[in-house]
Amino acid sequence: MPVLETEEEGRAYCAARCSTESLTKLELFGELLAEENTRQNLIARDSLKTIWVRHFADSIQLLTHVPRETTGPWLDLGTGAGLPGLVIAIARPDMSVILVENRRKRIEWLQNVTAGIGLQNVTIEGKKVEAVASMAATVISARAFAPLPKLLQLSTRFSTDATYWVLPKGRSAVQELETEEQAGLHGMFHVERSVTDADARILVGRGRPSYL
């Protein structure tokens, strides 16, 4: 599909993939995010003007790369402001979502937002990824968290042969993937275009890396 360019297009994209209740919660999340961003740097200030495209649609598009019947757990590493994890949890209230974040102020904010919006499907792991207990995640996501080699090193223990990986990347996606394939990843991932940025890509994969 064409790249989303306006906030109206971004909101319409989200509305087509969310219930009315979820869309209302996204609006509230946006208000809370803008307010908190005056106290701590959760997202780039300029991106608040394009929050529906840059953050909400950018997160919701990840759902198109996993089966609709998937109910989790969805593990979001280095969630930061809750992107994409909180957006996924809002859009899919039937999906169990686990947010991993190490920074104290952000942990507190995620806890407050989760309670304020009334999300019952979110668990917050307020610690480093290395300290999170091993689990079998159905989906693993990470936005601007770490280069692919380090990401896989940290997160492979959360994966199974059936795990889906959805990893938003910028222009480096192809290069990162080629590096890992040379190291023995053997076609586990492929590259998808982002609907929110002509230069951005998403690494999509399934399984458990076997070379680590």
What does each model-identified segment do?
Residues S96, N121-T123, Y164, G187-H190:
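Conserved beta-strand segments of alpha/beta enzyme cores
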Residues R171-L212:
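Active-site capping/gating segments
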Residues A57-A142, L152-Q153:
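Conserved SAM/SAH cofactor-binding pocket of Class I
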Residues M1-L75, K105-V122:
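Class I SAM-dependent transferase core
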Residues L148-P149:
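Short glycine-rich, flexible loops that bind phosphorylated cofactors or substrates
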Residues N102, F145, P168-S172:
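Short strand-turn motif at the edge of the Rossmann-like AdoMet-binding core
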Residues L152-W165:
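A short glycine-rich, Lys/Arg-flanked "PGG" loop and its adjoining helix->strand segment in the class I
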Residues K49, V129-E130, H190-S194:
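Short, solvent-exposed loop/turn elements at beta->coil junctions and helix N-caps
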